Regions:
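Membrane-interface "cap" regions at the ends of multi-pass membrane proteins
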Residues: 1-27, 56-61, 65-87, 246-250
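Inter-helical loop and helix-membrane interface segments of multi-pass membrane transporters/permeases
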Residues: 3-4, 32-36, 66-91, 104-165, ...
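Membrane-embedded translocation segments of transport machinery
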Residues: 2-6, 169, 173-322
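Extracellular loop-to-transmembrane helix junctions
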Residues: 4, 33-59, 144-145, 265
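Transmembrane helix-boundary motif of multi-pass solute transporters/channels
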Residues: 11-48, 198, 236-242, 253-256, ...
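Alpha-helical transmembrane segments and their helix-start/interface "positive-inside/aromatic belt" motifs
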Residues: 11, 38-46, 83-102, 169-179, ...
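Central hydrophobic cores of alpha-helical transmembrane segments in multi-pass inner-membrane proteins
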Residues: 24, 44, 49-61, 71-72, ...
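Hydrophobic core segments of alpha-helical transmembrane domains in multi-pass membrane transport
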Residues: 45-54, 93-118, 148-162, 177-190, ...
């Protein structure tokens, strides 16, 4: 059976970048920045991304393209006789399963929030305390979280079952394009909020006083971890995408494009979150709850978004008890 390939180079780039872009950029990056002192962490993160993340990403793509096989079989095809590099393939697969245990859970939180927004749970004028209570109410309801996690898993199975071109590539083009437009619009809006200047100063200007209680060593390790985490390195994901690459483009150029797109989304996410934190009084070191408290504030206090929301979902709004 002939191995399926991507329909276009853009499809490969968006699917590969989509693997890297996601919860690690939109959810994890802002809260780790907040817990790690802001600007200095961002600077170290970019340094590690260029000096360590990009080279490892390129090497993983190289393993995939050279073998044209999945993780374990790829190592077996390339390793010298008597060596045991294929064992890393099994470790990578185990890592993927462990990663999905909480990736699907957090993705479920996000889907839950989407439906709460369109059904009117989040209303214009809600304050930070109300948004925080909504998040912790969700955490106290395991059945709700389990339901949305199940929805995410089933959706993933459906997409993957429709083959590479008709499933993963097609939906990645739509979702990635939508994500890029959305985060740019939200970033522009956040930059117009009162308090945006203080948020940008915390986010983009290194300040040693911000890390006095954290420790420079912890900030360095966190930045290094994020550089590897954000590119999905070490779990054979990029090796699998590399196995679908042709030889008409260089590994370094494709790796650079993936890394650049991933970094753009991460940095832009910070431009959304931190100005909003200082505007709405959200603690920047709030941890995993950061975007689930900040983004509802951004959306419900964004008149244009609210006007779009009402006509699209009038039935939900009308059925909401007063």
């Amino acid at each position: 059976m002939e191995r399926e390939s991507f329909q276009s180079r853009l499809g490969f780039l968006l699917v590969s970048a989509g693997c890297a872009i996601g919860i690690g950029n939109v959810w994890r990056f802002p809260y780790v920045v907040g817990q790690s002192g802001g600007g200095l962490f961002v600077l170290l993160y970019l340094i590690f991304l260029i000096t360590m993340g990009l080279p490892v990403l390129t090497m993983e793509l190289a393993v995939g393209r050279a073998s044209k096989k999945s993780a374990v079989l790829g190592y077996k095809a390339l390793e010298k006789r008597g060596s045991y590099w294929h064992l890393h393939g099994y470790v990578a697969i185990l890592g993927c399963y462990m990663l999905m245990m909480y990736y699907t859970t957090v993705a479920g939180w996000m889907v839950s929030y989407f439906f709460k927004f369109v059904t009117g749970t989040f209303e214009t004028g809600m304050d930070t305390e109300s948004c925080s209570l909504e998040f912790f109410h969700m955490l106290s309801n395991p059945k709700e979280m389990g339901l949305w996690m199940f929805v995410v898993v089933i959706a993933g199975f459906i997409v993957c079952s429709r083959s590479l071109q008709n499933g993963l590539e097609r939906i990645s083009k739509v979702m990635m394009s939508s994500l890029l437009v959305l985060i740019i619009v939200l970033a522009i809006h956040s930059l117009t909020l009162s308090g945006a200047a203080e948020g940008l100063q915390f986010y983009l200007i290194p300040n040693l006083s911000n890390i006095q209680n954290i420790g420079i060593g912890k900030v360095i390790v966190s930045a290094m971890n994020q550089a590897f985490f954000t590119l999905s390195l070490g779990v054979a994901a990029m090796e699998i995408f590399g196995s679908y690459m042709g030889r008409e483009h260089t590994l370094a150029s494709e790796g650079l494009r993936i890394c650049a797109l991933d970094t753009f989304v991460a940095i832009t996410s910070g431009l959304i979150i931190f100005p909003a934190c200082f505007s709405f009084g959200v603690e920047v070191n709030a941890g995993p709850s950061l975007i689930f408290v900040t983004l509802p504030n951004v959306f419900v206090n964004m008149p244009a978004a609210y006007r779009l929301h009402n006509p699209v979902f009038p039935r939900f709004r009308d059925n909401k008890p007063s």
